[in-house]
């Protein structure tokens, strides 16, 4: 009998084929700004840009939607990058002095980035590396000369030449420091070495000439054609960088003392002793080094000199600046993060006599800024991608699918009004290389991110490029201490240097209480709820015109004067009084302040009923924002929940208190074994456990899915935290009358269901009558294992989730089945369970017991469309665990469909930030500035599909080492595993390019159907199941 019960059932081939058409797993694209960038390159012919990172990632960007991603096999920092112009090839230098050649190749109509060749110099050339010269140790600088030669400058001062086609050393072409010193006067040598090679620059007109700069200050023009030194410049100041003038008649050098010098190359063959111009822009006091300098000529005669660094060391040495000098105009661009590199977009054709720069692109540690150099004032150019998601730290996120076109246009219009008009740029985005082959998205998707500074940002998440649309700020509603400090700081600011704040990255929050914790948006009424750290809940409405009005303020006491609790956390925010001006966009109408002012942990918005529900660690409330009056307040604190009153900044238990509670638990466990109450439920649990122990033979091989779910103590810390809130029109009173309900789930496994009396709207009217809403407690369910309730959803008579407010009434979704019996799906951290309504009796359950310690973290209902049939789709439950695994279950049967490894289990922040979409996709943070996008749907995939117009040279075809797929992320999981065993190939989708390693889901998951005929003895199996729910019916 036992062998029969634990035997796995065979897979249905038809169902497995259908799974292939519905589900597949892809990590598709990384949205946002690369984490910890370290190198920058630009191809002026193809108009593409590359960014390298400290984790070894390579990212190439062109026009919006044109993206390529690669990852070096060794997690080393990319220190330099150089494009082979017009070839779609990129040379990277890592901090281990290895060189790597990447190529963009065409395959199946789309372009891909692959690593072709690599060059690894020996770490100790004198030992067993006779083929390598002794001076080839640490590479300090790389130059691509004459299109087919790689020039390497080293720490020893030697210069080596490699063939681009093979990355092999060219024999007999090494330039040693001794050979250079022979061209230098004796009095300059002074017995000192030249130092490392600091800079290598190729001549724009004559590719055979190379400008070499050594650390000590010596500059040399080397001719590859004659293999000789053509000119020597005897600099004495430590060198930082070099740049040729357009025609090659001048050289500009920058130095460690904050100065730059201009040298003339037309002085003949003798060594040049002095530069023609030496300037310290921010002198005369000691200045920091000018790290990089560019000289760009203009047809008008006023040339550009652009450099980073050089600030006065004592007063502004901590500033991150790039200075732009043209004629008598000097602007000091002041950034909030470190400058990595910069380049100009200018004319590079040899026949053009001038550079005529169009734009300046500055790569910073936390953002990319592009300035228009052709418009007076040099304004910033709005970026269509690479926006810094973390301009203020992300605290929450949400996704809104199928946004109506009218609402989309209104949000875009509000965002366009936010950009400063006087400094608007006439220049379009200058990085326009490649062609986006992806089709226009069939629906618009919004990604909403809440931030630490009290802002909510709206992003266009419809395609590959995550485009900023609109920013909502809530800080203006409240009085903060920073307002006076800001005005003083602006008054003290000097006129010199001429600083200009550039960029939007601002890591500092004015007040930590402003942080956004939860966001909800009704896409049909353009109403929104934003909840924050200090218990503030804002109800906002989209307005197309600016306005001035007073925001209604209401307080809701969640403790309800309960004695014995004293709040020790932060104070609530003080709102401004009186009418306030509001720009076009989302404008606040009502402010609800929870008491105590703890962080809001859950919100729900029902615009059709004009209700908003909110929860904290103390309880939950219901507010009627049409009448601007509270409807309900319920405290969920347990008498021992003192930790909830201490606030987020004082949650450290004393050792004395911890020891006392430990001894109490030991004493309680001993006593409970002797004096356990002999109730009917406890007798049933004891009988189940005894029967399981007696009937289970020890030699039976059990599936590794079964684990006893231990009931948690009712007095666990923070058991009153409200985890989820939900509105539904369903059957709660009886099986014949349905009506509005509100559901709340807590950390202690409690579920509260309220029947609401909401006045019905008149025929054709949008708003309901001005009558009070009433709430009556209908059911109270206590999960016996007391696991936190993560999500609640009501299913209609067909087993489908109820539509969103206004979806059915506006014929935007199929009306729910209100004839058959409804059911409620309750997802806790340990199991999923479906209960019938209105009796709340268990129908189906699924215990998530794949591994010890496995817990549910995120849950969402999603629609998965078939790739073979336009009309077939299934609604399933997507689940992310604390181990980083994603599971998909059927609804309402709760049968496992697929199981993938998505996020590393050590990546706690990534798991906590995950957001599922309604169409089987998801987002999670792989760094503070990047979202990883993934897809569980075989049909709904958003990934880069692009191409480059490249004329390949004949010898460009080289053996490939490896393709760098989009799945090999610098910050994510490298391996994609776990899916049904019978699905041996990837689905027959045009987007499916990879076959995943499969594994039978039964090895990790086990469904139980309580209503089935064979379920009688399943409840008495070896799990020792104690999950008998306790249900109170207050309406019976």
UniProtKB/Swiss-Prot annotation:
It comes from Rattus norvegicus (Rat). The keyword DNA-binding does not apply. It is found in: Early endosome membrane; Golgi apparatus, trans-Golgi network membrane; Golgi apparatus membrane; Cell projection, Axon. Complements a salt-sensitive yeast mutant (SOP-deleted mutant) and thus can regulate cation homeostasis. Phosphorylated by PRKCI. This is Lethal(2) giant larvae protein homolog 1. The modification Phosphoserine is found at residues 662, 964, 982, 989. Pfam families: Lgl_C (PF08596), LLGL (PF08366). One of its GO terms (biological process) is cortical actin cytoskeleton organization. GO terms for cellular component: axon; basolateral plasma membrane; cortical actin cytoskeleton; cytoplasm; cytoskeleton; early endosome membrane; Golgi cis cisterna; Golgi membrane. It comes from the Eukaryota. GO terms for molecular function: GTPase activator activity; myosin II binding; protein kinase binding; small GTPase binding. Residues 678-693 have a biased composition (Polar residues). WD repeats lie at residues 38-71, 78-119, 139-175, 199-233, 239-271, 289-331, 339-373, 395-473, 517-592, 601-662, 722-782, 791-843, 848-901, 915-938. Belongs to the WD repeat L(2)GL family. Gene3D superfamilies: YVTN repeat-like/Quinoprotein amine dehydrogenase. Cortical cytoskeleton protein found in a complex involved in maintaining cell polarity and epithelial integrity. Involved in the regulation of mitotic spindle orientation, proliferation, differentiation and tissue organization of neuroepithelial cells. Involved in axonogenesis through RAB10 activation thereby regulating vesicular membrane trafficking toward the axonal plasma membrane. Associated with nonmuscle myosin II heavy chain. Interacts with PRKCI/aPKC, PARD6B/Par-6 and PARD6A. Interacts with STX4A. Interacts with DCAF1. Interacts with RAB10 (GDP-bound form); the interaction is direct and promotes RAB10 association with membranes and activation through competition with the Rab inhibitor GDI1. InterPro entries: Lethal2_giant (IPR000664), Lgl_C_dom (IPR013905), LLGL2 (IPR013577), WD40/YVTN_repeat-like_dom_sf (IPR015943), WD40_repeat_dom_sf (IPR036322), WD40_rpt (IPR001680). Keywords: Cell projection, Cytoplasm, Cytoskeleton, Endosome, Exocytosis, Golgi apparatus, Membrane, Phosphoprotein, Repeat, WD repeat. The modification Phosphothreonine is found at residue 957. Expressed at high level in the testis and at lower level in ovary, brain, spleen and kidney. The lineage of its organism: Eukaryota, Metazoa, Chordata, Craniata, Vertebrata. Residues 670-694, 980-1002 are annotated as: Disordered.
